[in-house]
Amino acid sequence: MKQAISRIFNKDIKQIEELKKLDIHVNFNEDDILKANAVIIGPDDTLYEGSILYFKIVFPNNYPFHPPSITYLPNNKIRIHPNIYVNGRVCLSLLGTWSGPKWTSIMDISSILISIKSLLNNKNRKLINIK
């Protein structure tokens, strides 16, 4: 099973490399390919500019037919976004934790991470607890 998943990830490597241009970085666990960590740098000209957000990614055995789980790893106990909780929950339709378009097997981890980064483009300071 892990060999099949490894082949799928190999197809995604180019896209994962492209994420670096968007200040999104993914690092797979050397001992378990089903686990990874991601870092998203806050977008320029937003409240999150220069912020570093850490995420834990766990891929199911039936990936890509089901989405990975994504957990936010906060630096403190302050909620930074209406869709990103201090307890680690990320509300995103692709993850099945929010309304909207659902995950499909043609999607990959890039789809999720780009969607999370796009959440950070919201410039409405009233929605978040950062000054």
Model regions and ranges:
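UBC/E2-like fold recognition across ubiquitin and ubiquitin-like conjugation systems
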Residues: M1-I52, V58-K131
